Curated annotation (Swiss-Prot):
Residues 130-214 form the PDZ domain. It comes from the Eukaryota. Residues 468-479 have a biased composition (Polar residues). Pfam families: PDZ (PF00595). GO terms for cellular component: cell cortex. Residues 229-239 have a biased composition (Acidic residues). The keyword tRNA processing does not apply. Residues 221-315, 445-579 are annotated as: Disordered. The modification Phosphoserine is found at residues 236, 454. SUPFAM superfamilies: PDZ domain-like. Residues 282-298, 447-467, 530-547 have a biased composition (Basic and acidic residues). SMART domains: PDZ (SM00228). This is PDZ domain-containing protein 4.
Length: 769
């Protein structure tokens, strides 16, 4: 219910006392009884509240009862209309005065709600806003609690006291506490009876409220110069039409009859979202160039009330309506108004859809104002309008159709703009990479050959020829070489095409090998290994340049992750030389062997321009590291900077796998595998280390057990066996003699007594020699 008048929460609210609820006296009841009465009361709730005024009057004869407020819950359904007349409480006699002028007088609700002093400069600082609330059925509730005055003061207006958080009005977000309701569905309301009668009508599913509030400070940002600059940029044809319509309309009806297709500056509740969403209405240089930022290019537009077609109908009104009007166009208003652009300037949106969008916005604004279609702008009232309006149809049905079509066009326009921004971001990144490659190549060509350790080959630690891993992640990066080609525009391609081959070749004299056949057209570019033939390399480079787009300078093919400038620097020209693992001890002799092999008389010694250029190119982004093999030996390797490598690698993997589905993965010959992050790889290493320790412990325990069995003394075991055998024989011998004794037993063993305790001497004594 949202009533908090019976519980004192703030010190300044201690003077509030609830008098009646639906005609029942509550002033003498306790707090628990008051709560019980509120819970048991039926809707609609009519609450009469008494408060003390902080401003005492000299001619007042009553000291305690100064002001009386009465509030009515407005979420009234059709079933409660009949009960409303019966439950209406007796109110004090009201003094009927003339309604105050709408355009120049305003009573701040904070005066009588909180007792603040009245300001003299508040008369002209008013802001009007028309809010439309849509209900799916007449049983839905708006969720507004209105308050009105019942004392002898001149203020007879109706104010919004509270907004239910989960109601229709709260979801709309434009109605705030303290707003004064001027009109309901175009009808001026002066007292509670009129408001309740209009709000409780059954056929009203769409309710239009004209509210007034003090002008927000954000509305003063725009000056006349800003408005003139805005009109110069986007055309002022609609400005003249709006001025002509404003001069024809009476002053009292201006708030209800004027519409803009852009959303002007609203109150503080919507200022933040409008600042984030709208990038068109601001004319300063910093915001005009805002599209160059990465955040704007990503197209993250937060949802706000200005994105919906129903929120395009906001307006602010001050003392001089012509001079103080503020225009604030959002992204929707750019497409709606035209803004000096044609339909062809928006990619993906045809001219017909563009014109249709503008016409729908104009028709919607006129229908919401209650005007006829004959009063539309000339371009909307002509024969181009495809909307057939039947005067007999309901206004709500027509508005629903317009809303649906507008939402469809807005959704399409937003997707087009977001895709365009993402394309611009990709183009900028690719251009930056290409420029970086060119600059590094020029720098490498001008430097002398002065790097003594530049020929240390960066090769995998383990060479598993049987490995078929298609992805260089985790342990597989040490088992398979990378087959890559550099960027088509990169100058490294010319040197690498003639002097390097990523397929490993044993050291020895150069052997003439036939050039590899060209790959089939359907094979992807990332599986084409670099050819050793210079002519083939030049032809392939020319073909790559021919496939480039002349406008943007970008390749039409999808660039794989290996063609990233960061990954392409890992591969240098190796020519015919073999693979060497260098340790700190063997570094000098190995270097001498390499120089001897690349001498002028060596068969394997060829031009090494590509290797030098590549080494100089990757120098700023490489670092020397001492690696440790599994057997404990150490070697020096040149590795790229890890953060750049991992960042580029993760970005390319994400781009490649974004459009990959299960069916594509099953059909494709290359299995993408799974990409493990850095933390996951650390966990894998820890888990593998623990398993290895566990296996070593088990093997050591088994070896110790076997060693003890082999080296142990066998005598105790034999003694135990002999003793057991002897004990078994004794038991068997005892069971041989029983009461049934044969002659042979008598002769051999003697006789046993009846009790079995004594054995007599045998008759025969046999001695075996």
């Amino acid at each position: 219910m949202g009533c908090n008048m019976c519980v004192v929460q703030k010190p300044e609210e201690q003077y509030k006392v609830m008098l009646q609820v639906n005609g029942k006296e509550l002033s003498k009841l306790s707090q628990e009884q008051t709560l019980q009465a509120l819970r048991s009361s039926k809707e609609p709730l009519v609450i009469q509240v008494l408060r003390r005024s902080p401003r005492l009057r000299g001619d007042s004869s009553c000291h305690d009862l100064q002001l009386v407020d009465s509030g009515t819950q407005t979420d009234i359904t059709f079933e409660h209309i009949m009960a409303l007349g019966k439950l209406r409480p007796p109110t004090p006699p009201m003094v009927i005065l003339e309604p105050p002028p709408i355009s120049h007088e305003y009573y701040d609700p904070a005066e009588f709600m909180e007792g603040g002093p009245q300001e003299a400069d508040r008369l002209d600082e008013l802001e009007y806003e028309e809010v439309e609330l849509y209900k799916s059925s007449h049983r839905d509730k708006l969720g507004l609690m209105v308050c009105y005055r019942t004392d002898d003061e001149e203020d007879l207006g109706i104010y919004v006291g509270e907004v239910n958080p989960n109601s229709i009005a709260a979801k709309d977000g434009r109605i705030r506490e303290g707003d004064r309701i001027i009109q309901i569905n175009g009808v001026d309301v002066q007292n509670r009876e009129e408001a309740v009668a209009i709000l409780s009508q059954e056929e009203n599913t769409n309710i239009s409220l004209l509210v007034a509030r003090p002008e927000s400070q954000l509305a003063k940002r725009w000056k006349d110069s800003d408005r003139d600059d805005f009109l110069d940029d986007f055309g002022s044809e609609n400005e003249g039409e709006l001025r002509a319509r404003k001069l024809k309309s009476p002053p009292a009806q201006q708030p209800g009859n004027e519409e803009e297709k852009g959303a002007p500056d609203a109150g503080p509740g919507l200022s933040n979202s409008q600042e984030l969403d709208s990038g068109v209405g601001r004319t300063d240089e910093s915001t005009r160039n805002e599209e160059s930022s990465e955040h704007d290019l990503l197209g993250d537009e937060p949802p706000s009330s200005t994105n919906t077609p129903g929120s395009l109908r906001k307006f602010g009104l001050q003392g001089d309506a012509l001079q103080s009007r503020d225009f604030h166009f959002s992204m929707d208003s750019l497409l709606a108004e035209g803004a000096g652009l044609g339909g062809g300037d928006v990619p993906g949106l045809t001219d017909e859809e563009y014109e249709r969008y503008r016409e729908l916005l104009e028709i919607k604004c006129h229908l919401e104002n209650g005007n006829q279609l004959g009063l539309l702008f000339p371009r909307a009232s002509g024969g181009n309008s495809a909307l057939d309006v039947n005067r007999n149809e309901s206004l709500g049905h027509e508005m629903a159709m317009l809303e649906e079509e507008l939402r469809h066009l807005e959704f399409k326009c937003r997707n087009i703009l977001r895709a365009q921004k993402m394309q611009q971001l990709r183009e900028r990144c690719m251009k930056a990479w290409l420029l970086e490659e060119e600059s590094l190549y020029d720098l490498a060509a001008s430097e002398p050959k002065k790097h003594e350790l530049s020929d240390i080959s960066e090769l995998p630690e383990k060479s598993d020829k049987d490995s078929t891993s298609a992805y260089n992640t985790g342990e597989s990066c040490r088992s398979t070489p990378l087959l890559v080609e550099p960027l088509p525009e990169s100058p490294l391609r010319r040197a690498m095409a003639g002097n390097s081959n990523l397929n490993r070749t044993p050291p020895g004299p150069a052997v003439a090998t036939p050039a590899k056949a060209a790959p089939p057209p359907g094979s992807p570019a990332k599986f084409r290994s670099l050819s050793r033939d210079p002519e083939a390399g030049r032809r392939q480079h020319a073909e790559e340049r021919g496939r480039r787009n002349p406008k943007t300078g970008l390749t039409l093919e999808r660039v794989g992750p290996e063609s990233s400038p960061y990954l392409s620097r890992r591969h240098r020209g190796q020519g015919q030389e073999g693979e060497h693992y260098h340790s700190c001890v063997q570094l000098a002799p190995t270097r001498g062997l390499e120089e001897l092999g690349h001498g002028p008389l060596s068969l394997a010694g060829g031009p090494r321009v590509g290797g030098v250029a590549a080494a100089a190119t990757e120098a700023p982004r490489m670092e020397w590291k001492v690696k440790v093999r599994s057997d404990g030996t150490r070697y020096v390797a040149k590795r790229p900077v890890r953060d750049r490598l991992l960042k580029a690698r993760a970005l390319k993997i994400r781009e490649e796998r974004s459009g990959m589905t299960t069916d594509d993965d099953a059909v494709s010959e290359m299995k993408m595998g799974r990409y493990w992050s850095k933390e996951e790889r650390k966990q894998h290493l820890i888990r593998a280390r623990e398993q290895r320790k566990r296996r070593e412990f088990m093997m050591q325990s088994r070896l110790e057990c076997l060693r003890e069995q082999q080296n142990g003394d066998s005598k105790p075991e034999l003694n135990i066996i002999a003793l057991s055998h002897r004990k078994t024989m004794k038991k068997r011998n005892k069971k041989i003699l029983d009461n049934w004794i044969t002659i042979q037993e008598m002769l051999a063993h003697g006789a046993r007594s009846a009790d079995g305790k004594r054995v007599y001497n045998p008759l025969l004594s046999v001695t075996t020699v």
